[in-house]
A protein has these predicted regions:
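Conserved short alpha-helical segments that host acidic/polar catalytic motifs at enzyme active sites
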Residues: 1-237
Length: 237
């Protein structure tokens, strides 16, 4: 698979929606994730990321302007022991609760489907990072309608074992802007993952469409120790 330039991938599209990146730093020592949200409506743009325990949650920036919280207020990132869960919706909680009961990532997501926001039927994208005894594996998932038909849910899981240093994968909810919005297609895209968290966060943030970007979260986890550092960038400050 040919590597993409993530800067070019993001800057060439006004609205990829929500996006997840998972990978490994160039020096091989860090497990890396990034998650961004974008918005076209006032309700969707009225959000920030805030820390919540070891994870994050979305929160209304101006509570007085919050209209419908159902699909926009959730915890995108939660940590369950040596696993980090990243998603674009409340399926984070489904994965957390099911895996806490010894179910798998895939089993948890079989209980969920795409969002009910007709006619877009926004895909649910999810990822799980597993770090144990110096080993690091991850998986990514997308649940989407059958080419816009809500009668069928298509479920895809991509598992990556022993990820090479400096490589990662990117998945987003939409291919690009549109009406209705076209769901992401194909495998998660291969990209380079650098060592510098701040520089990577800045690159991603600067590449996202200025009008539509809302918030970005980046975390680098030390594979040997489990210690992590994170960065949150919110457009609303």
């Amino acid at each position: 698979m040919e590597k993409i330039s993530i800067a070019k991938e993001l800057s060439s599209k006004s609205y990829p929606g929500r996006g997840i990146i998972i990978g490994r730093s160039a020096d091989g020592t860090k497990a890396v994730t990034a998650f961004f949200i974008m918005g076209r409506s006032a309700n969707s743009r009225n959000r920030i990321f805030v820390e919540d325990g070891e994870g994050i949650r979305t929160q209304a920036f101006d509570e007085s302007k919050l209209e419908d919280p159902s699909l926009i207020i959730y915890a995108p990132v939660r940590v369950l022991g040596n696993k980090t869960i990243v998603t674009n919706g409340d399926q984070t909680d489904t994965i957390y609760e099911c895996m806490d009961r010894q179910m798998t990532f895939e089993q948890a997501l079989r209980t969920r489907e795409f969002e009910p926001d007709a006619p877009n039927y926004t895909p649910r994208i999810s990822a799980i990072m597993h770090i144990e005894n110096g080993e690091y594996n991850y998986a990514m998932s997308i649940l989407k309608s059958n080419n816009g038909n809500p009668d069928s849910c298509n479920r895809y899981t991509f598992a990556y074992n022993n990820c090479p240093a400096g490589e990662g994968h990117f998945i987003s909810t939409y291919l690009h802007d549109g009406d209705p919005l076209p769901s992401f297609e194909g495998e998660p895209k291969l990209l380079d993952i650098p060592d510098d968290m701040d520089a990577f966060a800045d690159l991603l943030w600067e590449s996202l469409n200025e009008q539509n970007k809302v918030s970005l979260f980046v975390r680098y986890i030390d594979i040997a120790t489990g210690k992590y550092e994170s960065k949150i960038i919110n457009k609303n400050v």
